[in-house]
Structure formats: C-alpha cells, structure tokens
C-alpha cells in the first residue's frame, strides 16, 4: 500500500495537480449561475434545505443527563485514534490525524480529557459539530445540485468521540439488525450479498427457473432521516438516555 501511494505521488508531481474549474450551476428556478459567489450561495442554500432540522415535536431534553454510562477509558481513546485511517482529508479545524499520531500519549491524554467532558455534559465543542461539504458529481445534469453526492468531512478529533460512541451503541444495534443485512455490519459487506445473488442466478440457470430481483435506490437516503423519529426508535430499542442525548445534541447544532 505504501509503495502504491508513493507511485501515485510521483505521478502527480510529474504531471502537476489538476484543479477542477467551478462551472455554472442552476438556481432553484432553473437559471444558470456563473459567478463564484452566486454558486457558493446556491450550494449553501441547497445544503441548508437538504439538512434542515425538523424543529417540530421536540422532546423536552434541556436537562443534563446525570445517570451516565461508564466513563470513557484512555484505552478507548487510543483504540479510536489508531483506527482512524491516515492520509484522509481534515475537517474544518485543518488538523491531520498524523499530528495526533506524532504526539502519541500526549494526544491520547488531551483527547481523553475533552471526550470525558463531553461525556459528562453531553455538550459537544462547536468545532466538532462542523462539517465541510464536498459535492461529488453523479450521473445526470452537472448543473443540478441534486445530481451531486455531498460528502461531509468532519474533524479527526470528533471522529475519535464518534467511534467511541459507536462502539458503545454496537451492543444495542447488533441485537436489532437482521441476519440478512450486509451493509454497515462488522465482518460483513455488500460484496457478500452480491456473491449470494450470483450463486442464486447460477442455480436458477442450472435448473432453468425464472428469477426476479427488485433493486430500490432511495433518493438522498441519509439526508432525509427524520431525527425526531430516530430518537423515538432509539428509545424503543432501550438505548440509554445518556447515549441518545449525546447523539441528539450533536445533530441539533
């Protein structure tokens, strides 16, 4: 892997860096926007609409949860930090994960202190709640914002806390997820499902049987999650109020 990365670096150094030109984009009325500032405003408008918060039917959760889950251990912070992939884009704070690796134990102690404070108060640092959105074009008209996939880049420090939180939630989610689910499962993947489909197709051909598949592609699936319903589902799953409050305060800005 390291040699491959060095190879691509030498190729980039030889041919130079490609800078994509920001082309025109359409506004909500279908008019072309060509000025950089207008394009930026349109993207801001689009992402705000895409990720707008549902402010209705809120639960009363202003109080800090005092019945806490077991405190975060330094070994959890170390594990989370080591599990973050290197050579990845930094979030809004611009701090690369490689810096934390260089600082070693000092980074672990510092992050542990901050994570412990978040754990107690359920209040996240504002920088940890910020995301940098990068639009990746999909198929279709490149002038339509809806034909882009928005990738959210968050700070590596925030990822440490999120990985710890995810690990704590895993014990609850594992008992709820069906065996047939391949995506977002440890030790499984959609490749396993593809292999199963290929095996089914092979057997259908072998025995000359008809076979039918239905593929559903939901538009903006992850962008359209109703958070109010999500909190209710977590409650039905008997996930602790403490963990739910941490997630809720992260999403409510």
Give names to the regions the model predicted.
Residues 175, 204-207, 236-243:
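Secondary-structure transition/capping motifs at alpha-helix termini
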Residues 2-147, 152, 156-160:
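Surface-exposed loop/turn segments and immediately adjacent short secondary-structure elements
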Residues 162-163, 167-184:
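Electropositive, glycine- and tryptophan-enriched low-complexity nucleic-acid-binding patches
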Residues 65, 94-103, 181-188, 215-221:
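Conserved short loop/turn motifs at secondary-structure junctions
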Residues 55-56, 123, 169, 173, ...:
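Proline-centered turn/helix-capping motifs that create local helix->coil transitions or kinks
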Residues 74-82, 110-118, 163-168, 193-205, ...:
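Inter-domain linker/hinge segments that demarcate the starts of reverse transcriptase
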Residues 24-25, 87-95, 133, 143-153, ...:
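Conserved catalytic palm subdomain of right-hand nucleotidyl-transferase polymerases, strongest
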């Amino acid at each position: 892997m390291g040699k491959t990365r060095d190879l691509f670096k030498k190729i980039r150094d030889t041919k130079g860096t490609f800078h994509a030109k920001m082309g025109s984009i359409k506004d909500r009325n279908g008019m072309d926007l060509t000025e950089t500032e207008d394009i930026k405003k349109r993207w801001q408008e689009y992402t705000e609409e895409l990720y707008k918060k549902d402010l209705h039917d809120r639960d009363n959760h202003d109080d800090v949860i005092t019945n806490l889950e077991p405190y975060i251990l330094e070994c959890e912070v170390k594990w989370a930090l080591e599990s973050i992939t290197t050579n990845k884009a930094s979030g809004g704070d611009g701090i690369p994960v490689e810096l934390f690796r260089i600082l070693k134990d000092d980074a672990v102690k510092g992050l542990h202190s901050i994570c412990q404070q978040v754990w107690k108060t359920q209040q996240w640092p504002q920088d940890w709640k910020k995301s940098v959105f990068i639009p990746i074009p999909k198929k279709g008209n490149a002038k339509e914002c809806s034909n882009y996939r928005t990738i959210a880049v968050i700070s590596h420090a925030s990822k440490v806390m999120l990985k710890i939180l995810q690990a704590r939630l895993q014990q609850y989610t594992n008992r709820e997820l069906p065996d047939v689910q391949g995506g977002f499962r440890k030790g499984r993947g959609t490749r396993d499902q593809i292999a199963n489909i290929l095996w089914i197709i092979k057997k259908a051909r072998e025995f000359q049987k008809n076979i039918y598949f239905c593929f559903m592609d939901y538009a903006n699936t992850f962008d359209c999650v109703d958070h109010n319903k999500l909190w209710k589902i977590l409650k039905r799953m008997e996930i602790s109020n403490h963990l739910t409050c941490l997630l809720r305060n992260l999403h409510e800005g």
